[in-house]
């Protein structure tokens, strides 16, 4: 897994964990 960012439909960025 690695750290990453995803953006929701409102354009907000938040930390996530990408496997």
Swiss-Prot record:
Keyword Disulfide bond found: yes
Pfam families with a match to the protein in the record: Toxin_3 (PF00537)
UniProt KW keywords: Antibiotic, Antimicrobial, Disulfide bond, Ion channel impairing toxin, Neurotoxin, Secreted, Toxin, Voltage-gated sodium channel impairing toxin
GO cellular component: extracellular region
Domain of life: Eukaryota
Tissue distribution of the protein: Expressed by the venom gland.
Gene Ontology molecular functions: sodium channel inhibitor activity; toxin activity
Role according to the record: May block sodium channels (Nav) found. Reversibly modifies the firing of DRG neurons by causing membrane depolarization and increasing the number of action potentials. Shows antimicrobial activity against the Gram-negative bacteria K.pneumoniae (MIC=64 uM), and only a very weak activity against S.aureus. Does not show hemolytic activity.
Protein name, UniProt field: Toxin Cm38
């Amino acid at each position: 897994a690695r750290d990453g960012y995803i953006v929701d439909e409102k354009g907000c960025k938040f930390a996530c964990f990408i496997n």
